[in-house]
Amino acid sequence: MYPPALTLLLTPGLVAAAIQPQAYASSADGRYKLSSYSAPVRGTGTPGSNSTWKLTIDDTPSGRKQTIKGFGAAVTDSTVSVFNALPSAQRTALLNTLMTTAGANFAMMRHTIASSDLSANPAYSYDDSNGQTDLSLSNFNLGGRGNAMASLLAEMRRLQPGLTILGSPWSPPGWMKLNRAIQGTTVNNNLDHAYASQFAQYFVKYLQAYQAKGATIDAITIQNEPLNSRAQMPTMYIYADEAGDLIQNNIGPALRNAGLDTKIWAYDHNTDQPSYPSTVLSRAGGYVPAVAWHCYASSLDWSVLTTFHNAHPGVEQYMTECWTSAKQPTPWNWAASFTMGPLQNWASGVTAWVLGTDTNDGPHLTGSDACDKCTGLVTVDAAAGTYNLRGDYYMMAQFSKFMKKGAVVMSGTGSWTYGDGSGLESVAATNADDGSRVVVIENKFGNEIYVTVEAKSGEVWSGLVYRNSVVTWVLPAAGA
């Protein structure tokens, strides 16, 4: 069966000045790590004895899809602590590698509002108030860990001025909940609506505190994984209609009245419950411009995002969490796949879980529910004063380094995965600044594939794609 064609659009009028075709690769065998690779050539080239694969790109206005906002990962307390444990020179080098064009050029970060499972003990919020009710939130305080988080995010924003920061809480202060606990029980693990106003003001105070430290937050979700209730980590259950009403009646107005333009994204959970964000939009659509998805559905299907887009074409979508692990190894292309799939289905950005951990996948809370196998894109050996960029980092950088913020994803066909997991997946975009066209190709075969890309404008590009690798082609503007 011959795979369908990939389509791509170039925005008219953009001129790519002296852009030469380039290619970069990251491979399963570690031979390539965001490394320069044989560039594609004009024409059909010479495939020799290599297997071939044909893609087509439609570089006309009909192919325009979503605009890229950025790629990155979750900044947790673990990330902050291990990055800050590095010697100054190493820390500076790492942040430049992550946040600038010298490295991954990450332009989106999701951070944890107070404690998550990837926090050292004890779990905390920004207004614990010794467990006592604090109606005026007079005891609100970022504390040492919150201040350290805000400082790191501010530093990231200075390095990447176009950075989009999303904040997500794992739990509000325990006194706001029916069970009066951040963690420890799943009984009555819900918001006490007697404190709905304080819940909304908690977000206001958090946003103002971070803004004062130079870490302006662009968007929030009101609860990480609102359908996940666990005893041994911070969680809180929020029903879909409840979430919509809280946003419409409390949180949205509170942010507006405080003069904050922070956006509220719906859901922040798995793709198997698309009715949840639909319900939120029906009840609070005026405050909700975007939906956030996670990758943990038992039967993961990113086409859910396309179906959702067709029902809600004006709503942005993001893939905001998918774990990476070394202790429970995921496939070599795991991070590439959880970036590729959402992009093919209308996602404007992707963030992995998690940006940084130590070499033991922590620090993390104790208890069976906390993730003790979540490994950062970066691991830090504090004793040695060194860091390691893991394979998942390179897989995500194959997208983030070349598909710049503002790039437009193009409609396409041509991607195909067989039942045994082999195949070739691709997504393409046009950069807004120079008109360069970026085609990311994920080769899931154990052999090299000679790929030919035919453009509707008349161009043909071809080149070899390394086995079990992700290769990014950077092509000049059409007609250049």
UniProtKB/Swiss-Prot annotation:
The biological process GO terms on file are:
glucosylceramide catabolic process
Can you cite an annotated GO cellular component? extracellular region
**Reaction catalysed by this chain?**
Random hydrolysis of (1->6)-linkages in (1->6)-beta-D-glucans
- The top EC class is hydrolase
Q: Name one Pfam family in it.
A: Glyco_hydro_30
Which family, according to the similarity comment? Belongs to the glycosyl hydrolase 30 family.
Query: Any idea what job this protein has?
Result: Partially degrades N.crassa cell wall beta-D-glucan, liberating small amounts of oligosaccharides.
Tell me the protein's name.
Answer: Endo-1,6-beta-D-glucanase
Q: Which organism is it from?
A: Neurospora crassa (strain ATCC 24698 / 74-OR23-1A / CBS 708.71 / DSM 1257 / FGSC 987)
Write the lineage as a comma-separated list.
Eukaryota, Fungi, Dikarya, Ascomycota, Pezizomycotina
